[in-house]
């Protein structure tokens, strides 16, 4: 929401990108995950989070839930949203407008930043955090893994078809 105009109008928005780090299993195909354990899934490379969100990140379900949430929050069709892997976890979202320009929300992977932003909306709290070192910054983006397409399809279907399907999706998770 920080990348949208103050009016929160979405009429000029062409696309919103939601980024995912890929979690602890980034780069592994689904067949390689047959023998991983809970501790493997809890070992996130970038974020320190609770167990539930760490597991959701490892399965990439958290981004499907964010997709469902964003559709309702911004009152936008699911087709406006794209899920993209961004291993560095620096860019958290990107809004692309009809004129071709894009604005992104960036910070180092520190949960205090989004929590503070949510709790203090529409002000910015002064919190101790490590700013981005733009002199040594490298950003990579990858397509969402094809072998996870079914779960994304289910999330999109939940938004398209019936609001209760989002509840079912979350409960099944």
Pin down the residues of each PLM region.
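Catalytic, metal-anchored helix/loop core of enzyme active sites in primary metabolism
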Residues: 1-173
């Amino acid at each position: 929401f920080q990348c949208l105009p103050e009016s929160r109008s979405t009429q000029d928005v062409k696309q919103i990108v939601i980024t995912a780090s890929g979690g602890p299993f980034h780069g592994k195909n689904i067949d390689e995950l047959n023998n991983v354990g809970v501790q493997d899934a809890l070992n996130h490379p970038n974020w320190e989070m609770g167990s539930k969100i760490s597991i959701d990140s490892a399965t990439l379900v958290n981004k499907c839930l964010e997709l469902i949430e964003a559709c309702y929050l911004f009152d936008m069709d699911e087709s406006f949203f794209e899920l993209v892997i961004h291993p560095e976890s620096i860019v958290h979202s990107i809004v692309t407008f009809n004129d071709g320009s894009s604005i992104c929300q960036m910070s180092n992977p520190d949960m205090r930043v989004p929590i503070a932003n949510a709790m203090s909306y529409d002000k910015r709290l002064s919190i101790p955090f490590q700013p981005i070192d733009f002199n040594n910054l490298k950003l990579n983006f990858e397509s969402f893994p094809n072998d996870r397409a079914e779960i994304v399809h289910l999330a999109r279907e939940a938004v398209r078809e019936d609001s209760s399907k989002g509840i079912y999706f979350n409960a099944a998770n």
